[in-house]
């Protein structure tokens, strides 16, 4: 799915359209769904749960029954947490923007790569191809770190919020542990600089544009 820095760039570009008042909390909410990987004994199915896709493989999300199941879980989360009177509403709004961006990523970009492999007579689930894809996600993220001008200083602003959790999904400890890992990996450690192999920076840039448009429409539809 989309890279961590790519998610943060999307969140950054949504600050003004969504009229975010607590940007640090919104950024942190945007990082939250993947923080489950900091859980002791982490297994892949746990991440499916935090992304509202219990039992759903990425390749199957487009199937009507899978998409309907995902949307029900999404609606359940928004009904529970996205209350305008909640002081943490923007934390959960950040969480939702991550999920919506991944939805766009899976149903458009990832599926396009799968179709391309199939058209070439190759295994649509080729492990080597998607290992290269994953490396390219990091390379594209690190180019964003070097080139994208965030509206607030990164990673400093991520440290302004510490006391938060996503009840029933991610604990405070997991969120803090994951955030520390993200900062170390993406902002403190020297990055490899080379051209992506299968997932280009231009392709990632187009995805960011598409995701921002989709998320704004989805949020407008939800609040109207």
In which residue ranges do the predicted regions lie?
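N-terminal leader/auxiliary helical segments
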Residues: 1-224
């Amino acid at each position: 799915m989309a890279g961590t820095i790519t998610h943060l760039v999307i969140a950054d570009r949504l600050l003004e359209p969504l009229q975010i008042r607590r940007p640090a909390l919104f950024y942190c909410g945007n990082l939250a769904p993947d923080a489950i990987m900091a859980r002791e004994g982490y297994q892949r199915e746990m991440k499916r749960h935090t992304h509202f896709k219990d039992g759903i493989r990425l390749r199957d999300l487009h199937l009507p029954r899978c998409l309907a199941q995902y949307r029900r879980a999404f609606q359940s989360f928004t009904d529970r947490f996205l209350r305008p009177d909640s002081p943490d509403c923007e934390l959960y709004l950040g969480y939702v923007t991550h999920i919506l961006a991944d939805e766009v990523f899976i149903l458009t970009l990832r599926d396009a790569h799968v179709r391309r492999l199939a058209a070439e007579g190759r295994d649509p689930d080729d492990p080597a191809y998607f290992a290269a894809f994953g490396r390219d996600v990091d390379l594209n993220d690190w180019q964003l770190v070097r080139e994208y001008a965030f509206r607030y200083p990164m990673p400093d602003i991520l440290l302004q919020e510490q006391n938060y959790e996503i009840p029933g999904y991610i604990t405070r400890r997991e969120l803090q542990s994951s955030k520390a890992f993200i900062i170390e990996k993406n902002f403190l450690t020297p990055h490899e600089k080379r051209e992506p192999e299968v997932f280009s920076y231009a392709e990632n840039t187009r995805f960011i544009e598409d995701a921002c448009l989709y998320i704004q429409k989805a949020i407008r539809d939800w609040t109207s």
